[in-house]
């Protein structure tokens, strides 16, 4: 079994949300099989930035990326999160 790398775009509730704190909250609430490989910020508009997370997770996860989106969407300070890319790691 191999892993996949999921690119997740996380939109904060407002421009007042601290993205570093949001990143910490997300990383603490992810299942133990998930690992954040990299994080970036992306300007959206009017001072609002999105958090871009590169998450490694098992390929054979039941429900695919739905579980990842659900966990992140239920965190305080998150407006919504969406998968913008996915690729298989290894062969």
UniProtKB/Swiss-Prot annotation:
- Per the similarity annotation, which family is this? Belongs to the EF-1-beta/EF-1-delta family.
Which GO terms fall under molecular function for this chain's record?
translation elongation factor activity
Q: Which organism is it from?
A: Saccharolobus islandicus (strain L.S.2.15 / Lassen #1) (Sulfolobus islandicus)
Q: What does this protein do?
A: Promotes the exchange of GDP for GTP in EF-1-alpha/GDP, thus allowing the regeneration of EF-1-alpha/GTP that could then be used to form the ternary complex EF-1-alpha/GTP/AAtRNA.
Query: Pfam families under this entry?
Result: EF1_GNE
**Which top-rank group of organisms is this from?**
Archaea
Record HAMAP family: EF1_beta (MF_00043)
Please give the PANTHER family that the UniProt record associates with this protein: ELONGATION FACTOR 1-BETA
This one is known as Elongation factor 1-beta
Disulfide partners = none
**Keyword annotations from UniProtKB, A to Z:** Elongation factor, Protein biosynthesis
